[in-house]
Amino acid sequence: MLLAIDAGNTNVVFAVFEGDVKRGQWRVSTDGRRTADEHAVWLVALMAMKGLTPKDIHAAILSSVVPAQTGPLTTLCEEHFGCTPMRVGDPGVRLGLEVRIDNPKEAGADRLVNAVAAVATYPPPLVVIDIGTGTTFDVVDANGDFAGGVIAPGPVLSLDALHRVAAQLPKVDILRPDRVIGKGTVAAMQSGMFWGYTGMIEGILTRIKAELSPTGDPPVTVIGTGGLVRLFAEGSSLVDAIDADLTLRGLRLIHQRNAAR
């Protein structure tokens, strides 16, 4: 079985695949101080609840945008699961698509993994919007190559920043308000976040589509993923599909392609 690890700025997600079938998935908040042993304690316990043991794992793949966790997660695989993980971005790890940007080394591993899964599942050209700590719009052109994209602050990060710098503004939950005009501070902040963010998403997607396919032929497919994408997709008609497993599936595909070489 394959252990796939996606280390993001907000969460680290683990999944076990048996062939194409996902046997289990677990999530922990990202903490740069967490050690390999600490990861192992809770992960092995949760795997056991699914009838899985470390001996079931024969290979691993890691995508990390958190340098402080790349080492501990590599050690986790080596010391507790008996395998050295394939790491997205390492020399020799092939993605199966070309990275056509000014400096390919700058592209975040998570963005590339999403692109790999998207182009294997949906017809290009396409855009993957991933709403997390940051919000990324990742573009795959009509040839199936990664063509760049847009990076913006995520909604939680934006709200936290507003709360920190404006003394009288409270922390609020992110939700879709019933109306645009807020009758109080909390309602006004929630409206500003939801509708402002929805407007940003639609504005950026409209402009990307115009650049990527000026005539609309071929049409551009928009795929949403990430923890908050479903909420914001409800406010927009431009997201064609929501694919919660996109990143994990991309990791499985990358491992599959490289292991077969």
UniProtKB/Swiss-Prot annotation:
Cofactor comment: A monovalent cation. Ammonium or potassium.
Residues where ATP binds: D6, A7, G8, N9, T10, N11, V12, V13, T133
Cellular component GO terms held in the UniProt record: cytoplasm
InterPro entries given in the database record: ATPase_NBD, Type_III_PanK
Active site: D110
Alphabetized SUPFAM superfamilies for the sequence: Actin-like ATPase domain (SSF53067)
List of residues binding K(+): D130
Transmembrane segments annotated in the record for this chain: none
Pfam families named in the record: Pan_kinase (PF03309)
GO BP terms: coenzyme A biosynthetic process
Subcellular location, record wording: Cytoplasm
GO molecular function: ATP binding; metal ion binding; pantothenate kinase activity
Domain of life assignment: Bacteria
Enzyme nomenclature, EC number: 2.7.1.33
Pathway: Cofactor biosynthesis; coenzyme A biosynthesis; CoA from (R)-pantothenate: step 1/5
Enzyme class: transferase
Annotated substrate binding sites: G108, A109, D110, R111, T185
Reaction it catalyzes: (R)-pantothenate + ATP = (R)-4'-phosphopantothenate + ADP + H(+)
Cofactor: NH4(+); K(+)
Alphabetic keyword roster: ATP-binding, Coenzyme A biosynthesis, Cytoplasm, Kinase, Metal-binding, Nucleotide-binding, Potassium, Transferase
Subunit structure of this chain's protein: Homodimer.
Function text: Catalyzes the phosphorylation of pantothenate (Pan), the first step in CoA biosynthesis.
HAMAP family: Pantothen_kinase_3
Family: Belongs to the type III pantothenate kinase family.
Name under which the protein is recorded: Type III pantothenate kinase
Lineage: Bacteria, Pseudomonadati, Pseudomonadota, Alphaproteobacteria, Rhodospirillales
